[in-house]
Amino acid sequence: MVPISMAPDRGANSLVSLRFTTFAVSTVCLPLFAFLFCIVWSLLFNFSETTETHCHVPNYLPSVSAAIGGETPQRYLWRLCIGLHSAPRFLVAMAYLKYYQGTPCSNPYYPRLCHINFLLNSCEIFFLMLLTYVSSSENHEVHKLGFMSFMFFSLGYMFVTCTLWRMTRKWSGSPEERTSYAWKKRLFGFYLLMFLASIVVYIWHNMYCEPGVYTLFAFLEYLVVLSNMAFHMTAWWDFGNKELMICSPGDKRI
């Protein structure tokens, strides 16, 4: 289904061959590692700096913005991992576009939705880079724009992805396709629920400044981030035995 195909055997002209599932999931693991490192390091070594609130009420967890962009070395590692994972993410986005285009569907809107899905995915990656490289302490308004745009495009991407899978009746496909579709729906629902809950808690914190409320907000932020990463990790089921291959010009592979 994907035009990054695995040949029956690896010829002598194949220079590099990597399972595409490994490639796609490893790409997501870079920001996952950086995210967990930033949270743990902030709690251990920059607790007071990263948990301070504007109204000085007790708080026990750093927000995502404070953890990844407030202090060093967290900011350096986060930017490094996001930078390293960005180009491969665009390649995965292109692979998904070809994947969907290669899936039969009679719905007349399906081809257009495939391209919209690719655009949403690309914008999600772009605005993730924007909010990463412009921290809230450097330029709060630009960072805020990056964050809000990232959330908008990531929600749109998840919704359109689930719509595409429903259009192509993936629930009646292979076991891997059924598993992937089921997890995509669960993770999208969880992501949306946690995002809406975090907005409510954030407004609650700004209105009343009660102890521990910002801690709850930060925890909900963590769940939002982790569910987003988990959604992208469903690529493990989507690409099966496909391989990413670099071949010499004489090797006629797509």
From Swiss-Prot:
Per its UniProt record, what InterPro entries does this chain match?
Answer: Frag1/DRAM/Sfk1, PGAP2
Q: Give the enzyme's EC designation.
A: 2.3.-.-
Main subcellular location of this protein, as a coarse class: Golgi
Q: Which top EC class is named for this enzyme in its record?
A: transferase
Q: Which GO terms describe its biological process?
A: GPI anchor biosynthetic process
Give the source's domain of life in one word.
Answer: Eukaryota
The annotated topology with respect to the bilayer is: Multi-pass membrane protein
GO terms for CC?
Answer: endoplasmic reticulum membrane; Golgi membrane
Q: Which UniProt keywords apply?
A: Golgi apparatus, GPI-anchor biosynthesis, Membrane, Transferase, Transmembrane, Transmembrane helix
The segments annotated as topological domain Lumenal are: 46-113, 166-186, 232-254
**Which chain regions cross the lipid bilayer?**
25-45, 114-134, 145-165, 187-207, 211-231
Q: Is-annotated flag, keyword Zinc-finger?
A: no
Regarding protein family, the annotation reads:
Belongs to the PGAP2 family.
State the protein's purpose.
Involved in the fatty acid remodeling steps of GPI-anchor maturation where the unsaturated acyl chain at sn-2 of inositol phosphate is replaced by a saturated stearoyl chain. May catalyze the second step of the fatty acid remodeling, by reacylating a lyso-GPI intermediate at sn-2 of inositol phosphate by a saturated chain. The fatty acid remodeling steps is critical for the integration of GPI-APs into lipid rafts.
The identity of this protein, by name, is: Acyltransferase PGAP2
Annotated organism of origin: Xenopus laevis
